[in-house]
Amino acid sequence: MKFTPPPSSLRGPLVIPDKIMMGPGPSNCSKRVLAALNNTCLSNFHDELFQVIDEVKDGLRYIFQTENRTTMCITGSAHTGMEALLCNLLEEGDIVLIANNGIWAERAINMATRYGADVRVLGGPADKPFSMTDFKKAIEQHRPKCLFVVHGDSSSGLLQPLEGLGKICHDYDCLLLVDAVASLCGVPFYMDKWEIDGVYTGSQKVLGAPPGITPISISPKALEVIRSRKTPSKVFYWDLLILGNYWGCYDEQKRYHHTVPSNLIFALREAIAQIAEEGLEPVIRRRQECAEQMYRGLQAMGLEIFVKDPEYRLPTVTCIMIPKGVNWWKVSEYAMNNFSLEIQGGFGPTMGIAWRAGIMGESSTLQRVNFYLYAFKESLKATHPDYVFEKKNGQTNGTK
């Protein structure tokens, strides 16, 4: 046998530097979560794996605040949650209304179009939420099968209120689907109380687990819609009836679907367990306190926040406006090279005009926030020596 020689790049050991991850995700994992990854990989049908899966389902119902039986995880990044909801609940020609004021709603528009849905769009500015009146008028006009809404948009730092929206949707026989990737466990979320029919979140964001596994939950009403489809879900991999069977949601004999990432499930279990041990209320309060400290520190530097109204700011992701004359990349590069701190740029509606600061995972402490503010200021001073930190007329802005 003759083979090409092995690549020289693999001759040395793997070296990954420690970094303080304070962008919009992924976040730093705790030592406990990372240790869970070192367990033995288990086979799909080992009893010990099913035991952990049951514990994860219990934890997910807690953080989603739901009693939905169809609560599970999908192998893949949080985009798989968006795909799964849309491809399971939409059939060719179904009307879906998407509230679009950020990059993730644009992704949903792209996906729903690919599934052959009749996509209608409720548009709005990236820094302001939709009102319940906006939603009601649009639902009355379009009569959609589903309404898709992003709860917390990591591309803008905007928080969209949801309370009361589920009832509006159900009054018009419409399902409410929610992206809670960047918001869950950073702000209050009540799936059952708010009458939400489908939701997913990201393991690598506020929860502080590794990426690659996506928690998702659907209501009995949504499950009924899926079961009554005229055609099977277009994507086998995201078929929630088959996935839910393996995750023990339907009182059926479990069947093989795909090899699940057992060690990611272990890590997610530990991340949720840490939240459960502290309690949702103190977990959320701590992140909100960290966000307030972030706002105060940025304002003291004369910097503006993209979302002007504090009521609608997402505590887990703050978009910081780039002052005129400042090269955002130089600041981010300096912070990484000198402080091992991630200061990430904008995305979607904030690309080129803002930085994004994350308060997620292990970085949800006042100590980390204060470090971020210190490193940010030092990086701005070092890369732009002429920049003047000041407030003008009570407004937060910087001058050069």
Swiss-Prot record:
Gene3D superfamilies on file: Aspartate Aminotransferase, domain 1, Type I PLP-dependent aspartate aminotransferase-like (Major domain)
GO cellular component: peroxisome
The reaction(s) this protein catalyses: glyoxylate + L-alanine = glycine + pyruvate; L-kynurenine + glyoxylate = kynurenate + glycine + H2O; 3-hydroxy-L-kynurenine + glyoxylate = xanthurenate + glycine + H2O; 3-hydroxy-L-kynurenine + pyruvate = xanthurenate + L-alanine + H2O
EC number: 2.6.1.63, 2.6.1.44
Complex formation: Homodimer. May form homotetramer.
Enzyme class (EC, first level): transferase
Protein's name according to its UniProt entry: 3-hydroxykynurenine transaminase
Family named by the database record: Belongs to the class-V pyridoxal-phosphate-dependent aminotransferase family.
Cofactor(s) needed for function: pyridoxal 5'-phosphate
SUPFAM superfamilies according to UniProt: PLP-dependent transferases (SSF53383)
The protein's role, per its UniProt record: Catalyzes the pyridoxal 5'-phosphate-dependent transamination of both 3-hydroxykynurenine and L-kynurenine to xanthurenic acid and kynurenic acid, respectively, preferentially using the alpha-ketoacid pyruvate, glyoxylate or oxaloacetate as the amino group acceptor. The affinity and catalytic efficiency for 3-hydroxykynurenine is higher than for L-kynurenine. Involved in the detoxification of cytotoxic metabolite 3-hydroxykynurenine generated by the hydroxylation of L-kynurenine, an intermediate in the tryptophan catabolism pathway.
Domain of life: Eukaryota
MF terms (GO), sorted A to Z: alanine-glyoxylate transaminase activity; kynurenine-glyoxylate transaminase activity; L-serine-pyruvate transaminase activity
PANTHER family for the chain: ALANINE--GLYOXYLATE AMINOTRANSFERASE, AMINOTRANSFERASE CLASS V
Pfam family of the protein (one): Aminotran_5
Pathway assignment: Amino-acid degradation; L-kynurenine degradation; kynurenate from L-kynurenine: step 1/2
GO biological process: glycine biosynthetic process, by transamination of glyoxylate; glyoxylate catabolic process; L-kynurenine catabolic process
Positions that bind pyridoxal 5'-phosphate: 77-79, 154, 204, 256, 259
Amino-acid positions noted as binding substrate in the UniProt annotation, renumbered to this chain: 154, 356
N6-(pyridoxal phosphate)lysine carried by residues: 205
Noted pH dependence of activity: Optimum pH is 9 with 3-hydroxykynurenine and pyruvate, or L-alanine and glyoxylate as substrates (at 50 degrees Celsius).
Thermoactivity: Optimum temperature is 55 degrees Celsius with 3-hydroxykynurenine and pyruvate at pH 7. Optimum temperature is 60 degrees Celsius with L-alanine and glyoxylate at pH 7.
CDD domains referenced in this protein's UniProt entry, alphabetically: AGAT_like
Annotated keywords: Aminotransferase, Peroxisome, Pyridoxal phosphate, Transferase
Chain positions covered by the region annotation Binds to and confers specificity for 3-hydroxykynurenine: 43-44
